[in-house]
């Protein structure tokens, strides 16, 4: 279907066409190879921004550390990280003055959370640096390994399952003279394959015990592993992101809980809300500024951009903020919250995989691991890499670089937002004490600043004052990348505001299409995405109808399930034609079985099986939804599933869709090749967890299934539950006396085994 693209714009106001300029169609760029260079860039840049600070040496690890706090006041417009403690504290005090009781209340909420949070909170999240294996692992596995090592080193506070007790273990582990860990290693040997008679490499996985002295353990506990950020659109250069280990994560979680609680109470904060709620919150601030700038005042808005937000922030500043926010709170609470910034002040950045070299004859490839960068001859490297390595060398310890200043990406989003809002808060007339005043919006490093004044000079003065105030707390507004406009037109976190928010539809483009989970889920997710965009993103009825047709077309090509009466030949067409011919009510066939599409924009909320149920032949119904059919997925039927959809920017978000279990909701089997790698042990652990959890849920069906709170273990809980259920069943005559006796005997045996263990 050919469309002349210029026709689209005939009647569209310019601001609505903004979304067509976004780089969101097609595949996003991914990084290949090693992230070592990007990480070195980050470390070197961060030190450059703070270069006039004081150097000290960490007594425990021997790492050189740069402290820029209370450094020289800037004399030019270059970005710098010299935050002034007293300025930050004063900004906090004024924030509290404008919002009486805000810190007090947030502390109380957080204290409650600290008492109640379970350690399994840390299993959420993707890749995590696993310090026991010195590489990334899924969060659940990294946590399990950490707890296992703690246990074998005599740390057991964590048995109760509260996060705070796990953190006590972390603190104790740092005082130990040595920690014993189990590491995995691979042995490779060449053997002859019996079948093919060729030589093959056989890998076996070994486990060995290793002792870490206090210094090595501390370095690992303070290490952030680095990777390259993938799928970033609109940028030519890749950049490094960090993933912290389990020792840091729990402490960060509580700090962010406190900061989140504060952000929720601040009208200028774009976090932690999202979507329509965020738009409403922002529109309020704009409305306030426009209403108050009567005919006598001018109002201008800056679409702001900060230079290297993370690299100029400083954990020592966050420590000062937390010290102030929690000043009237109990000692233990203040201690728990100050550990995260302390650990970040002493953090180490792992340089990643290192460099790959190839000889000119292309016969040889060799990997230079990051650990060797400290000693290798630099003649092998090109100029730019050589400069990087020379610069970073004084900071290297065991393949990690000491990185005291700066925060890595995405660690303290909420807390840094509080800092940003505290500067926006200073724009009230009672603080500026002149004719200009400002307000704005802050969401992590993104901001919009609205300045009101009687004339242009006043606006300029207001912007200058804001700019300089930011400099005092280590925030560097970029004069090159920020632009100013009459209030009413600006952009904030990719929301475009023009007398109200304009839908930036292009951002949703990547989530249209076929997800590739299975036929059932893909159909459901596809129509749900279209439905959601009609609700939230100004997707009009005509466009939605077209999107639906394109989706169905895409779906049929993906699963080769063209209509039974089509001429298109695919691998499946023979079977589908046969089905089509022997089906009486053809409208009842699912699209994935070669049926027609009955969706239109009015019925997108109904799962396809329900939509067509009345139209189906009886024997088709029986095959499709028969629990004895081996192809029907045997998961309990959840009425709602979660899919991960990729919006164009920001993290993948979870989206709910209706799920009906049929023969089409198959779950693909896992790739076998993992079984031959060092990941195999991890896989076995995961399966064991899975089995335990499934067993537990059998004993505590979802109606009564709350996470076990209290001190009994899962086994004890299941045994006592089994006894209670057995007694009830016996007394009501559902089971015989012999069965009851057998259950009791099994329970006693389990308890006995647990005691012996």
UniProtKB/Swiss-Prot annotation:
One of its GO terms (cellular component) is host cell nucleus. It is found in: Host nucleus; Host cytoplasm. A motif (Nuclear localization signal) lies at residues 187-195, 203-216. Residues 249-256 are annotated as: Promoter-binding site. Keywords: Eukaryotic host gene expression shutoff by virus, Eukaryotic host transcription shutoff by virus, Host cytoplasm, Host gene expression shutoff by virus, Host nucleus, Host-virus interaction, Inhibition of host RNA polymerase II by virus, Nucleotide-binding, Nucleotidyltransferase, Phosphoprotein, RNA-directed RNA polymerase, Transferase, Viral RNA replication, Viral transcription. It comes from the Viruses. Residues 286-483 form the RdRp catalytic domain. GO terms for biological process: DNA-templated transcription; symbiont-mediated suppression of host gene expression; symbiont-mediated suppression of host mRNA transcription via inhibition of RNA polymerase II activity; viral RNA genome replication; viral transcription. InterPro entries: RNA-dir_pol_NSvirus (IPR007099), RNA_pol_PB1_influenza (IPR001407). It holds the Pfam family Flu_PB1. Its main location: host cell. GO terms for molecular function: nucleotide binding; RNA binding; RNA-directed RNA polymerase activity. PROSITE patterns: RDRP_SSRNA_NEG_SEG. Phosphorylated by host PRKCA. Its EC number is 2.7.7.48. It catalyses: RNA(n) + a ribonucleoside 5'-triphosphate = RNA(n+1) + diphosphate. RNA-dependent RNA polymerase which is responsible for replication and transcription of virus RNA segments. The transcription of viral mRNAs occurs by a unique mechanism called cap-snatching. 5' methylated caps of cellular mRNAs are cleaved after 10-13 nucleotides by PA. In turn, these short capped RNAs are used as primers by PB1 for transcription of viral mRNAs. During virus replication, PB1 initiates RNA synthesis and copy vRNA into complementary RNA (cRNA) which in turn serves as a template for the production of more vRNAs. HAMAP family: INFV_RDRP. Influenza RNA polymerase is composed of three subunits: PB1, PB2 and PA. Interacts (via N-terminus) with PA (via C-terminus). Interacts (via C-terminus) with PB2 (via N-terminus); this interaction is essential for transcription initiation. Belongs to the influenza viruses polymerase PB1 family. This is RNA-directed RNA polymerase catalytic subunit. It comes from Influenza A virus (strain A/Turkey/Ontario/6118/1968 H8N4).
